[in-house]
């Protein structure tokens, strides 16, 4: 893969799924796997798996499949697993605090290092996470200075919709390059900033629809 290689967004979103599945195979001592086996395990069709992998060149061999260790090492580099990504949570209500306590305990390259809130009562709040670390919470007024101190370029946004865009503008001004957006609105950012929206309500409503209409969807295939 070269720096000019264009990877579709859908493919990029599947890469962590491939990585964690390959990690589980490696831990289980499995040496080799083919696209059909990957497909059956993670519920993507085999053609999608092969197409996703093809964007990165020749990762496997016809008749042999894929070497698990080599493939895991490759995706580890693609996903920058050897680089520590410092993250800030903006909005330390119930959801924000839950994320800070969890702190991506099963990931070695993601670390929430600070939180921010508009409530002055939370300024001295410290959150103990599942990794045994204590995460400080700062005033939103200290956003830019604290982010710059720790070279944080990724933020998780868990503020109410009415303040989401204003806070987003502050994050962009502070140099944030990526935002995981849990707020109920679609925020606007410059082209240089990436946003991943997480809408729990929409996801649940979609799930309910599929549960209620399972037979109709099944028969339409």
Curated annotation (Swiss-Prot):
Gene3D superfamilies the UniProt entry points to: NAD(P)-binding Rossmann-like Domain, Winged helix-like DNA-binding domain superfamily/Winged helix DNA-binding domain
GO cellular component terms listed in the entry, alphabetical order: cytoplasm
Pfam families reported for this sequence: CoA_binding (PF02629), Put_DNA-bind_N (PF06971)
DNA-binding region: 17-56
Family (UniProt): Belongs to the transcriptional regulatory Rex family.
Quaternary assembly: Homodimer.
Name of the featured protein: Redox-sensing transcriptional repressor Rex
């Amino acid at each position: 893969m070269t720096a000019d290689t264009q990877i579709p967004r859908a493919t990029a979103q599947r890469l962590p799924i491939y990585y964690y599945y390959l990690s589980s195979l490696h831990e289980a001592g499995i040496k080799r796997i083919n696209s059909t086996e990957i497909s059956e395990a993670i519920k993507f069709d085999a053609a999608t798996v092969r197409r996703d992998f093809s964007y990165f060149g020749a990762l496997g061999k016809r008749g042999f499949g894929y070497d698990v260790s080599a493939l895991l090492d490759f995706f580890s580099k693609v996903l920058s697993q050897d680089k520590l990504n410092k993250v800030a949570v903006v909005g330390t209500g119930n959801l924000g605090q839950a994320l800070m306590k969890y702190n991506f305990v099963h990931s070695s390259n993601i670390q929430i290092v600070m939180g921010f809130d508009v409530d002055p009562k939370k300024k001295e709040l410290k959150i103990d996470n599942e990794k045994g670390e204590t995460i400080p919470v700062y005033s939103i007024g200290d956003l830019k200075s604290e982010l710059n101190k720790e070279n944080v370029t990724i933020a998780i946004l868990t503020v109410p919709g009415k303040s989401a865009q204003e806070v987003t503008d502050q994050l962009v001004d502070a140099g944030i390059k990526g935002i995981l957006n849990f707020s109920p609105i679609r925020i606007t950012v410059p082209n240089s900033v990436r946003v991943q929206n997480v809408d729990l309500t929409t996801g649940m409503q979609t799930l309910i629809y599929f549960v209620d209409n399972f037979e109709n969807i099944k028969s339409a295939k």
